[in-house]
Amino acid sequence: MLDRIIINKEPKFFITEETAMEKNKYAGTQTEKNLEAAFAGESQARNKYTYFASVAKKEGYEQMAALFLSTAENEKEHAKLWFKELGGIGNTAENLLEAAAGENYEWTDMYAGFAETAEKEGFKALAAKFRLVAAIEKRHEERYRALLKNLENAEVFERSEVKIWECRNCGHIVVGTKAPVVCPTCAHPQAFFEIMAENY
């Protein structure tokens, strides 16, 4: 649903029409279209205002930057209202699946088509950018699918082999096959643990 709202093109969904109707009581109505437009407009406004805040900050206008950011947060909440009405927020597994489907559409269809059109119209540099972003979207899809697999296999906080687990709150390290239920240092719950990434 998110992809259709943002890019106005129906992606390949992994949910049935019946499920969609249960989640979205507005399906097939003009009100649904209005909610989609409201969600898209508020989402785009939020992003624009964060970009505008960066410019104001660089130009030395802290108050204006803060107001842009404050308004962006308001727009985020407005967008969330409409997205919830559309039944667009599921549980984490559903959200990962929806996100993966959206990223798949972006790299396999949307950006590929945009690049082809830009190329035909003589915008070779832009076509190259579309292709570069498509490669990033492919990686996003892979990441969401890997996280979904971890969730489905109950491997978010436990693995069959020894791993180094790091608390995202305080940095406490645990070596073992699973993350502790509670961090022994800061008492944050297991949800704050992840497999330590050493990419430096």
Give the residues covered by each predicted segment.
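Non-heme di-metal
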Residues: E17-Y200
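Short, Lys/Arg-enriched N-terminal segments with co-localized hydrophobic residues
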Residues: R4-A20
